[in-house]
């Protein structure tokens, strides 16, 4: 059964998609509430732990989330969405419980690590699900626009809602987070298991399962999986630094943006909140329209526009202090990410081989996530050594480099070398990363 939404040219919302959307929203609420609002204050003011312990705990969450995405993607291919997400959410429930009732930094650090590992399957599951549901329908960009709305919405709602309850009792706040995860767990039970398309049953039957041959054969199965990926995933080598730079540019600004607004621009917390809401609203309003246009006309123009706009806007924040200019730049940054968010993953989806899509998604997400791990570390050093503008200049430079890389790898007429599975799928013609029904396989 599928639901039609007025204004959508194609059927996008399915029960599976809606479940993934709600799970994404709830998990982002929990993560943003914990990492932004609760842990820094709870660990410092209530438990009396050091700033170093707080920083390490937050880093452990990012590391667990990032480096377990590839295994999670591999697991989705073999046991399906339901079991993968259920395992991750059960682990997340246990992690939040450890954080809530653990009073030592070691226990809280363990909880943060488990939370990262538990939420790692989320993006591979979502992207794999969208890839499967939109295959042949040319509406991946539209679907990504809707999913990104849940991500941004959950990230914004979490800290705001939790702030309403945090003054009464931290215990009550933790129960709210556990309740959100419990609802997500119930929704995960509605996800499909291993779904095999008719045309791919033979290929899937040949694919090694998690338990095929017992644990002693697991290493051989993994080796076979990565051999298949190496033979069939033939993309431009420049795609890998592009994946890193896309998140590195954001990671550079994440730890210092609040400090910059308060100490350099001298704005109040209320005005800072208004700026964030304004930029976020511009992004959210543009996600679905840009996603639909990318489905129709391809991703190249929209990504180039987004990267150029982000480069100029972030550079402007480093150079200008006038409030009128700051407002314009914030709106432009919001618009740039409305161009980038739904179209970036759409472009990546066109690079996937026929088999092992979940594993490849996890691999790409791990590379991309490294930028969010490295960026904050470098950002602080840049601030201390070269001043407040330095992180913005490096972030703008990263966006500029990303624009140049994308101009090169997406240029018209570019020929790529593909593995046997892709050559068979395209009749021997190289695959161009421009999507949309009007784009052709070159």
Where are these regions (language model features)?
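Juxtamembrane intracellular "pre-TM" segments in multi-pass secondary transporters
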Residues: 2-14, 195-240, 423-438
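Helix-loop boundary and gating motifs at the non-cytosolic
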Residues: 12-62, 235-238, 242, 247-265
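Residue-level signature of mid-helix packing/kink "hotspots" within the transmembrane helices
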Residues: 62-70, 155-156, 280-288, 372-373
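Helix-to-loop junctions at the C-terminal end of transmembrane segments
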Residues: 67-80, 166, 287-298, 383-384
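Structural signature of the two symmetry-related core transmembrane helices
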Residues: 83-97, 301-316
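Paired small-residue
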Residues: 95, 106-114, 324-332
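Cytoplasmic helix-loop-helix junction between adjacent transmembrane helices
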Residues: 113-151, 347
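Symmetry-related core transmembrane helices of the 12-TM Major Facilitator Superfamily/SLC fold
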Residues: 173-190, 392-407
């Amino acid at each position: 059964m599928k639901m039609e939404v007025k204004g959508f040219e194609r059927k996008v919302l399915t029960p599976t998609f809606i479940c993934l959307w709600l799970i994404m929203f709830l998990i982002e609420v929990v993560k943003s509430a914990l990492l932004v609002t609760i842990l820094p204050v709870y660990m410092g003011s209530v438990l009396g732990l050091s700033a170093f312990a707080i920083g390490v705990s937050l880093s452990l969450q990012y590391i667990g989330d990032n480096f377990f995405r590839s295994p999670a993607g591999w697991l989705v291919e073999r046991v399906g969405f339901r079991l993968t997400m259920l395992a991750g959410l059960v682990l997340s429930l246990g992690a939040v419980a450890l954080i809530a009732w653990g009073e030592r930094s070691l226990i809280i650090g363990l909880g943060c690590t488990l939370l990262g590992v538990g939420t790692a399957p989320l993006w591979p599951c979502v992207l794999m699900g969208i890839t499967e549901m939109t295959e042949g329908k040319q509406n991946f960009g539209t679907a990504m626009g809707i999913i990104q709305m849940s991500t941004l919405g959950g990230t914004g709602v979490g800290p705001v809602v939790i702030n309403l309850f945090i003054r009464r009792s931290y215990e009550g706040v933790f129960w709210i987070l556990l309740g959100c995860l419990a609802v997500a767990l119930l929704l995960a039970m509605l996800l499909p298991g291993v779904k095999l398309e008719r045309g791919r049953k033979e290929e899937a039957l040949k694919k090694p399962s998690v338990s095929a041959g017992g644990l002693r054969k697991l290493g051989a199965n993994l080796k076979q999986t990565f051999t298949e990926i190496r033979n069939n995933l033939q993309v431009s080598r420049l795609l890998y630094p592009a994946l890193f730079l896309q998140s590195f540019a954001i990671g550079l600004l994440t730890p210092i943006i609040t400090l910059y607004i308060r100490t350099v621009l001298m704005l109040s917390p209320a005005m800072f909140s208004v700026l964030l809401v304004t930029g976020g609203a511009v992004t959210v309003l543009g996600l679905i329209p840009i996603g639909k246009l990318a489905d129709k006309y391809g991703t190249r123009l929209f990504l180039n526009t987004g990267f150029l706009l982000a480069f100029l806007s972030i550079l402007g924040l480093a150079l200008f202090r006038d409030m009128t200019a700051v407002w314009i730049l914030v709106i432009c940054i919001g618009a740039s990410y409305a161009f980038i968010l739904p179209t970036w993953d759409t472009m990546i989806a066109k690079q996937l081989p026929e088999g092992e899509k979940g594993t490849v998604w996890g691999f790409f997400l791990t590379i991309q996530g490294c930028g969010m791990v490295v960026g904050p570390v470098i950002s602080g050093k840049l601030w201390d050594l070269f001043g407040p503008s330095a992180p913005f200049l490096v972030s703008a430079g990263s966006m500029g480099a990303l624009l140049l890389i994308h101009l090169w790898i997406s240029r018209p007429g570019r020929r790529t070398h593909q593995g046997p599975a892709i050559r068979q799928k395209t009749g021997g013609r190289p695959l161009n990363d421009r999507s949309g029904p009007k784009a052709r396989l070159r």
